[in-house]
């Protein structure tokens, strides 16, 4: 497998909206085998309990592979994959590598296709970006933008971890929903 394709309103790779947990697990197992990711533990699955019993969220983990699927009434309604895959497989949306392309460039490109909602007043320093018309959401743990380097107080305060902060120029997770 060379590429994990993100398809709006449909899915990511072989993980498709509308699949049951059993179908998703089979798809994850096939993808992990195709990626030649093996560990002694096998695929680990963890569940998040939700207040509404009609919903559940399952996380599928195997070494560098991590996906999260939210289900409603036993059918996938949201599928996410994590950036840890980026060195093994290209995760692409409209041929754009979503984990190797700076977040600012991803958002600029996606805004040509559909409107964007972000979680902070300063779009460049947001951590979550949603494109409702496309059923696509991007997330990063923290925001970082080169303009922060113009703030002397920020640079001094962040001196020890500044190189690490630059990883937040990129997204951590891409999600597909209906």
Sequence positions of predicted segments:
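Amphipathic alpha-helical segments
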Residues: 15-35, 99-116
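Amphipathic N-proximal alpha-helical interface segments
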Residues: 1-11, 32-98, 113-178
């Amino acid at each position: 497998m060379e590429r994990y394709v993100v398809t709006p309103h449909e899915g990511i790779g072989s993980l498709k909206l509308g699949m049951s947990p059993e179908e998703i697990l089979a798809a994850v197992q096939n993808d992990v085998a195709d990626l030649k990711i093996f560990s002694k533990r096998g695929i680990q699955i963890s569940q998040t309990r939700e207040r509404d019993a009609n919903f559940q969220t399952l996380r599928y983990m195997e070494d560098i592979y991590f996906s999260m699927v939210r289900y409603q009434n036993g059918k996938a309604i949201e599928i996410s994959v994590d950036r840890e895959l980026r060195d093994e497989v290209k995760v692409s949306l409209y041929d754009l590598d979503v984990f190797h392309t700076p977040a600012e460039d991803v958002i600029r490109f996606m805004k040509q296709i559909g409107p964007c909602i972000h979680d902070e007043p300063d779009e460049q320093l947001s951590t979550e970006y949603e494109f409702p018309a496309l059923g696509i959401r991007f997330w990063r743990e923290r925001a970082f933008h080169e303009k922060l380097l113009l703030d002397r107080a920020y640079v001094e305060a962040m001196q020890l971890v500044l190189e690490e902060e630059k990883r937040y120029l990129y997204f951590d997770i891409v999600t597909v929903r209906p």
